[in-house]
Amino acid sequence: MNIPLTPLRFLRYPEQQFPRKTALVCGDKRFSYAEFGARVGQLAGVLRSLGVQTEDRVAFRSTNCHRLLEAYYGVLEAGGVLLPLNIRLSPQELAYVLNDAGVTTLFLESAFLPLAEAFRNSVSLIKNFVLLDGPPQTSWLMPQNYDDLLSAATPLRRDLMAVEENSLAELFYASGTSANPKGVMLTHRNLHLHALSVALAMKSSHETIELHTIPLFHANGWGAAHLITFLGGTHVMIHRFDPAEVFRHPTPYLALDCE
């Protein structure tokens, strides 16, 4: 029997084995593995209700937050391909990436709405705009925001035995220092094996608490979005890494009670 390799397996295990353990911390929000998994299933249900089909590109323009981490599993559960967007790209670069990747659904934080206005009319394939935070923006075809959609969603989880491990799972764009940004394609198998190899090299364990200082859109966050879940550790998300702020008030990060 061939068992497909996919990072979706990483979340299923801690959901079942230690559902009450803290999986994710973001500001004053904490989610157990059971709650994390439930939100992932709700996101997958939202995407399917929006018409996302197998290998449709779903982009997130977001700083590090719990919603972006949920996308690393929810988009794949829906059969889509996740594209975390570099928040430092110009409107022209963003329009190029969105069109080149064929993105059909875009999630974005409210802070990026003014910038997004500059490329909105330059993208042709996007059918769905979803606001990650803040009040709904009807002028942007966003009658509901992310959490509203999740609360009304019918949860969806994939049959992992039906996953094609060599199918595309995530898509990242390099900076394009000499030309336009170039897409980097990662399969389910790529992501699964990378997490396993890094876990062995770093000698990490279920006690690991990862402060995500690297943006998840940068080099896939060095794989930490999947590595920590695979270990059954705890993700700690901060929107922007400010060294002075972290070391001025280190207690929330260094003394987390995550059990």
List the predicted regions and their residue ranges.
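Conserved S/T- and glycine-rich ATP-binding loop of Class I adenylate-forming
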Residues: 58, 75, 106, 168, ...
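Structural core segment of the AMP-binding/adenylate-forming
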Residues: 49-50, 77-148
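Conserved AMP-binding A3 loop
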Residues: 32-34, 169-193
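Conserved AMP-binding/adenylation subdomain of ANL enzymes
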Residues: 192-209, 217-257
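Conserved pre-ATP/AMP-binding loop-to-beta segment of ANL
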Residues: 19, 136, 151-173, 180, ...
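A short helix-loop-beta submotif of the ANL/AMP-binding
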Residues: 44, 57, 63-83, 87-91, ...
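Conserved AMP-binding/adenylate-forming core of the ANL superfamily
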Residues: 3, 20-65, 69-73, 90-95, ...
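Adenylate-forming
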Residues: 63, 108-117, 214, 239-242, ...
